[in-house]
Amino acid sequence: MAWIPLLLPLLILCTVSVASYELTQPSSVSVSPGQTARITCSGDVLAKKYARWFQQKPGQAPVLVIYKDSERPSGIPERFSGSSSGTTVTLTISGAQVEDEADYYCYSAADNN
């Protein structure tokens, strides 16, 4: 993907279906470096199950950035945060950096309590 100056595309998967659960995300979110990016994920299962967020850069394995809706694993920068409201979860990247350009996936499954 070509870098456009002052534009930080955060590309995300539109729809993920896992164990008959359908989760929907917008096709893309674009922000300038330093701005706040918010990526939503919605699905009925999210009212009962936690969401996890993964970041994946080209040629690399996915990295867990948020679990249990809002918990951040060790080593993940504080600019990454998660929240939940009803059937929607949100990944927020406050002060997005160029290195945050990636695909972001939300995930929830039957074994995810």
UniProtKB/Swiss-Prot annotation:
Pfam family name, one: V-set
SUPFAM superfamilies: Immunoglobulin
Region (Framework-1): 20-41
Region annotation Complementarity-determining-1: where it falls in the sequence: 42-50
GO cellular component, one term: extracellular region
Top-rank lineage group of the source organism: Eukaryota
Ig-like domain mapped to chain residues: 21-113
Cystine crosslinks: 41-106
Main location: secreted
Record's subcellular location: Secreted; Cell membrane
InterPro entries: Ig-like_dom, Ig-like_dom_sf, Ig-like_fold, Ig_sub, Ig_V-set, IgV_Light_Chain
Alphabetic keyword roster: Adaptive immunity, Cell membrane, Disulfide bond, Immunity, Immunoglobulin, Immunoglobulin domain, Membrane, Secreted, Signal
Region ranges (Complementarity-determining-2): 68-70
Region annotation Complementarity-determining-3: where it falls in the sequence: 107-113
GO MF term set: antigen binding
Signal peptide annotation: 1-20
Annotated spans, Framework-2: 51-67
One of the GO BP terms on file: immune response
Gene3D superfamilies assigned: Immunoglobulins
Region Framework-3, residue ranges: 71-106
Subunit structure: Immunoglobulins are composed of two identical heavy chains and two identical light chains; disulfide-linked.
Chain's role: V region of the variable domain of immunoglobulin light chains that participates in the antigen recognition. Immunoglobulins, also known as antibodies, are membrane-bound or secreted glycoproteins produced by B lymphocytes. In the recognition phase of humoral immunity, the membrane-bound immunoglobulins serve as receptors which, upon binding of a specific antigen, trigger the clonal expansion and differentiation of B lymphocytes into immunoglobulins-secreting plasma cells.
Protein known as: Immunoglobulin lambda variable 3-27
Natural source organism: Homo sapiens (Human)
